Amino acid sequence: MFKLLLIEDDESLFHEIKDRLTGWSYDVYGIQDFSQVLQEFAAVNPDCVIIDVQLPKFDGFHWCRLIRSRSNVPILFLSSRDHPADMVMSMQLGADDFIQKPFHFDVLIAKIQAMFRRVHHYNTEPSTIKTWCGAAVDAEQNLVSNDKGSVELTKNEMFILKQLIEQKNKIVSREELIRSLWNDERFVSDNTLTVNVNRLRKKLDALQLGAYIETKVGQGYIAKEEDKFYD
């Protein structure tokens, strides 16, 4: 889970943004003492910073300058002022993006996701091949292979399988899968997820693996190991 440090002194707006971001599976931290922003930044060690221009004690530009001198963490500025100079200043200080208040929450999410794609390189792994139930799961080639043969998956099917394997023997909710797909810009609906899982299971049947992807009614899905079955 990515950690976000939200540096916003408007408590109402802070809690509104935090609640929405938490719903997208981000871990959101705030600032307790606005004279100690740098120390609190170091303590949290966030994956992303969202910072308002206007803050108590020192403005956001001051803290951006100090944070950027110590870290390459993505920084997104918020501002209620309609001043082009604010955007120019934020970029000159090393911020990655800027959004003016009031803003639509979907725009904020899109900007955060874009920063993570640029900086953290979504979906890059040291190895794209995993093993599961005696099969090789090649995420780069979208292939699953075992001694029964090989099947080719679509990108969405492979993405879903990877998410389930990474949490094997644990229930992954439908909501979590949909959020993950949206985070990766694979825009799917609830019905589309059902279709993809059913299609994935049918393809895995050719390798005698379909039964290892189990539906938990009202909860989600689970990728089981060969020796772990559930009632």
From Swiss-Prot:
Name of the molecule in the record: Sensory transduction protein BceR
Residue stretches making up the Response regulatory domain: 3-116
GO terms for MF: phosphorelay response regulator activity; transcription cis-regulatory region binding
InterPro entries according to UniProt: CheY-like_superfamily (IPR011006), OmpR/PhoB-type_DNA-bd (IPR001867), Sig_transdc_resp-reg_C-effctor (IPR016032), Sig_transdc_resp-reg_receiver (IPR001789), WalR-like (IPR039420), WH-like_DNA-bd_sf (IPR036388)
Highest taxon listed in the record's lineage: Bacteria
Record PTM text: Phosphorylated by BceS.
Key word Ligase present: no
Function field: Member of the two-component regulatory system BceS/BceR involved in the regulation of bacitracin resistance. When activated by BceS, binds to the upstream region of the bceAB promoter and up-regulates the expression of these two genes.
Gene Ontology BP annotations: regulation of DNA-templated transcription
4-aspartylphosphate modified-residue sites: 52
SMART domains: REC (SM00448), Trans_reg_C (SM00862)
Database matches in Gene3D superfamilies: 3.40.50.2300, Winged helix-like DNA-binding domain superfamily/Winged helix DNA-binding domain (1.10.10.10)
Cellular compartments annotated: Cytoplasm
DNA-binding region coordinates: 127-225
Gene Ontology, cellular component aspect: cytosol; protein-DNA complex
Pfam families in the cross-refs: Response_reg, Trans_reg_C
The gene coding this protein: bceR
PROSITE patterns associated with the record: OMPR_PHOB, RESPONSE_REGULATORY
